[in-house]
Amino acid sequence: MLSPIQTFLGQHNLDGFLFVGDSICDADMYYLSRFLAGDRFAILAQEKTTLLVSSMETGRARKESIADECLSTSQYQIMEKMRRCEKPEEAYLQVLLEFLQGHGIKRLGVPFRFPAGIYQSLLQDIEVSVSDSPASRWREIKRQEELDAIACTQR
């Protein structure tokens, strides 16, 4: 049986769905990762969930998140790229593209609130479509552990 993300990706003819932001402001990112971070990171939702975080957050992400895989931007030589690029954002965009290509992404979905600059950059190499976040729909239906936590909080 296909997982909800596999079903969503198949219905939309996508190789993955990407979130970039912080999980304090983006409930979908927290829902998918259970990793609470105020700094920007990326989540690639495919059959497995992969986080791309800064090297300072890698250990904590591996320990706290429910992601299948946690990768560091340093694995993609972000510091070397930063030395070569005029702007740090350009280095991050190169890392992100390398990360996505390494995960076989040719057709990518992103949520409506996705950062515009990153979206425009990715369009040069990847087919990107914007849609509602699948995680927003999944968050509407509470799992038993979530219902228990709500009940406990309301007592």
What are these model-derived regions, one by one?
Residues 1-98, 155:
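N-terminal accessory/capping or targeting/presequence segment of soluble
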Residues 88-155:
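Flexible, acidic/His-enriched mid-domain "rim/lid" segments that flank
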